[in-house]
């Protein structure tokens, strides 16, 4: 199996906390936009933003894969994009991996008030091939797509 790599950061290895979650049954397209929105944010701000999107108080901006996404009035002008959605399933898994990374940072003794998301990315996972029985002895192939999420928190 290949090793886990990430961009070279100019932060001491002891000031980083990492977390990975693999084979998440969520769309890579939604996860891409969620990761792009919270990259570089402080941990508490990112969690608050994602919880607001879950409660539909604020829409998540969609930069890529936004075909058919409506313009939302509750998107902040700082995003410089008007179309957005509420990808709840993807956000639940991102919150889960952020919580794991926060626990890792806490066990390393990092100050959680000054922790920032230095790296977050979503990658394609494995594709599970399934078959659905049809009439007259036939079957139709069905795919289940998965994704991987990786997070690195750093103390600023």
Swiss-Prot record:
It comes from the Archaea. GO terms for biological process: cytoplasmic translation. It holds the Pfam family Ribosomal_L22. One of its GO terms (molecular function) is rRNA binding. Keywords: Ribonucleoprotein, Ribosomal protein, RNA-binding, rRNA-binding. GO terms for cellular component: cytosolic large ribosomal subunit. Belongs to the universal ribosomal protein uL22 family. PANTHER family: 60S RIBOSOMAL PROTEIN L17. This protein binds specifically to 23S rRNA. It makes multiple contacts with different domains of the 23S rRNA in the assembled 50S subunit and ribosome. This is Large ribosomal subunit protein uL22.
């Amino acid at each position: 199996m290949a090793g886990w790599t990430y961009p070279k950061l100019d932060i001491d290895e002891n000031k980083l906390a990492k977390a990975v979650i693999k084979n998440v049954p969520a769309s890579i397209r939604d996860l891409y936009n969620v990761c792009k929105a919270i990259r570089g944010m402080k941990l508490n701000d990112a969690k608050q933003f994602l919880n607001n999107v879950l409660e539909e108080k604020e829409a998540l901006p969609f930069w890529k894969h936004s075909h058919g996404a409506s313009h939302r009035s509750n998107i902040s002008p700082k995003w410089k994009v008007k179309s957005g959605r509420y990808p709840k399933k993807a956000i639940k898994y991102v919150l889960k991996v952020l919580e794991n990374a926060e626990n890792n940072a806490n066990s390393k003794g990092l100050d959680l008030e000054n922790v920032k998301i230095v790296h977050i990315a979503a990658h394609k996972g494995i594709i599970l091939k399934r078959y659905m029985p049809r009439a007259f002895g036939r079957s139709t192939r069905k795919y289940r797509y998965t994704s991987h999420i990786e997070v690195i928190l750093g103390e600023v």
